[in-house]
């Protein structure tokens, strides 16, 4: 079993870290620079920064905030939200990001995945895929624009396609589980991990220590991402790692 990663996520709106349930009911939870440093010091393996309204508002990402966060941390840093061109990606990497997360723009322009992987290396191209279960329970669809638009695209087919196009990693969020604290969507996560050779980061729904274990055991995922659980100090990164070590999950100390 490969070494697993614990990744806090900063969902940023108007320069502040926010959190909601199923991308709705947004509330302010803190300053992104302060929280980034806090998680870096706690021993997080990576940090994800998502400007959650950049695409919907048709604007660029908050570059200044990205630069300030990058100055405060010494762990791999992924940035996403509103990136729609090679120029956008180049600017974010120059601002201090180690990886970029593509979501809505990649669905609208598949060529961006292939070109960005070619120019910048697939190791820094993370495909963020938000999935929602179909009403007839026959599988999952890809949703974009912060969950506002159901594309009708079959999620598993999309995973296979983006892997072939050069995505180096999948950041998989279950819209059904997001913010509920009822546990990760294990069925969705396992289904994705089974059909792709690239690492899968599970996101959405984590509510307790056992949820981390459930999604990381048996190679269900390569990494687990959480937000509100860490923001509200219900658990620390150290708590999670100590628990996983006791459960014999390979993790960086």
Curated annotation (Swiss-Prot):
GO terms for molecular function: imidazoleglycerol-phosphate synthase activity; lyase activity. The active site is at 11, 130. One of its GO terms (cellular component) is cytoplasm. Pfam families: His_biosynth. Its EC number is 4.3.2.10. InterPro entries: Aldolase_TIM (IPR013785), His_biosynth (IPR006062), HisF (IPR004651), IGPS_HisA/HisF (IPR050064), RibuloseP-bd_barrel (IPR011060). Keywords: Amino-acid biosynthesis, Cytoplasm, Histidine biosynthesis, Lyase. Pathway: Amino-acid biosynthesis; L-histidine biosynthesis; L-histidine from 5-phospho-alpha-D-ribose 1-diphosphate: step 5/9. It catalyses: 5-[(5-phospho-1-deoxy-D-ribulos-1-ylimino)methylamino]-1-(5-phospho-beta-D-ribosyl)imidazole-4-carboxamide + L-glutamine = D-erythro-1-(imidazol-4-yl)glycerol 3-phosphate + 5-amino-1-(5-phospho-beta-D-ribosyl)imidazole-4-carboxamide + L-glutamate + H(+). It is found in: Cytoplasm. One of its GO terms (biological process) is L-histidine biosynthetic process. IGPS catalyzes the conversion of PRFAR and glutamine to IGP, AICAR and glutamate. The HisF subunit catalyzes the cyclization activity that produces IGP and AICAR from PRFAR using the ammonia provided by the HisH subunit. Heterodimer of HisH and HisF. Belongs to the HisA/HisF family. This is Imidazole glycerol phosphate synthase subunit HisF.
């Amino acid at each position: 079993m490969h070494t697993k990663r614990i990744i806090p996520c900063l969902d940023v709106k108007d320069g502040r870290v926010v959190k909601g349930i199923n991308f709705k009911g947004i509330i302010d939870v803190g300053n992104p620079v302060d929280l980034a440093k806090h998680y870096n010091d706690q021993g997080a393996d990576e940090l994800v920064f998502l400007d959650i309204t950049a695409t919907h508002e048709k604007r660029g990402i908050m570059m200044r905030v990205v630069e300030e966060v990058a100055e405060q941390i010494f762990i791999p840093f992924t940035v996403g939200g509103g990136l729609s061109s090679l120029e956008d990606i180049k600017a974010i990497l120059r601002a201090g990001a180690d990886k970029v997360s593509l979501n809505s723009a990649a669905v609208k322009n598949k060529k961006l995945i292939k070109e960005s992987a070619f120019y910048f290396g697939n190791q820094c191209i993370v495909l963020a895929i938000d999935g929602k279960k179909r009403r007839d329970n026959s599988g999952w669809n890809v949703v974009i624009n912060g969950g506002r638009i159901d594309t009708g695209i079959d999620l598993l087919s999309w995973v296979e396609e983006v892997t072939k196009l050069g995505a180096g990693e999948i950041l998989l969020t279950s819209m059904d589980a997001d913010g509920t604290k009822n546990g990760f969507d294990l069925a969705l996560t396992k289904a994705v991990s089974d059909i792709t050779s690239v690492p899968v980061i599970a996101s959405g729904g984590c509510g307790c220590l056992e949820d981390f274990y459930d999604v990381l055991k048996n190679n269900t995922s390569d990494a687990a991402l959480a937000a509100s659980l860490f923001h509200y100090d219900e658990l620390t990164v150290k708590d999670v790692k100590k628990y996983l070590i006791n459960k014999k999950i390979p993790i960086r100390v």
